[in-house]
């Protein structure tokens, strides 16, 4: 039931912003402002995660932009996730101990919501 409701919300979101690609969705999310960023300097996989929120037609949408580290320390591969409202809270309380595990536990389960996440399988 939760997935069904999230799918309906996602459809409303996509029709409202008329974004067709993951890059367009990401650019729209970035245009929402600064967001709240959690940086992981010591992690092997996650460089930073930035959370954004937006209200559309009386529904609040929550996004996480995740930067995965690359060989060049100044670069990262960025992906957008549509997450639940509680995701930022649980991620922020767990990322200092292990950002990679916090990502796996709290953000990765939302990988299929937008279809913009990398495939880790």
Describe the function of each predicted region.
Residues 53-65:
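Short acidic, Gly/Pro-enriched loop/turn segments at secondary-structure junctions
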Residues 73-84:
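A short macromolecule-binding patch
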Residues 3-13:
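Sec-dependent N-terminal signal peptides
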Residues 15-19:
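Sec/Tat signal peptide C-region and signal peptidase I cleavage site
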Residues 91-121:
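C-terminal partner/receptor-binding element of secreted or periplasmic proteins
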Residues 20-26:
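Cleaved targeting-peptide boundary
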């Amino acid at each position: 039931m939760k997935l069904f409701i999230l799918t309906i919300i996602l459809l409303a979101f996509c029709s409202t912003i008329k974004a067709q690609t993951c890059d367009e969705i990401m650019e729209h999310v970035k245009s929402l402002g600064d967001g709240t960023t959690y940086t992981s300097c010591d992690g092997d996989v996650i460089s930073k995660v930035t959370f954004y929120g937006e209200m559309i037609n009386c529904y609040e949408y929550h996004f996480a932009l995740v930067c995965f580290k690359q060989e060049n320390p100044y670069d990262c591969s960025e992906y957008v996730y549509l997450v639940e409202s509680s995701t930022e809270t649980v991620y922020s309380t767990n990322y200092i101990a292990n950002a990679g595990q916090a990502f796996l536990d709290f953000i990765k389960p939302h990988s299929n919501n937008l279809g913009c996440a990398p495939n880790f399988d």
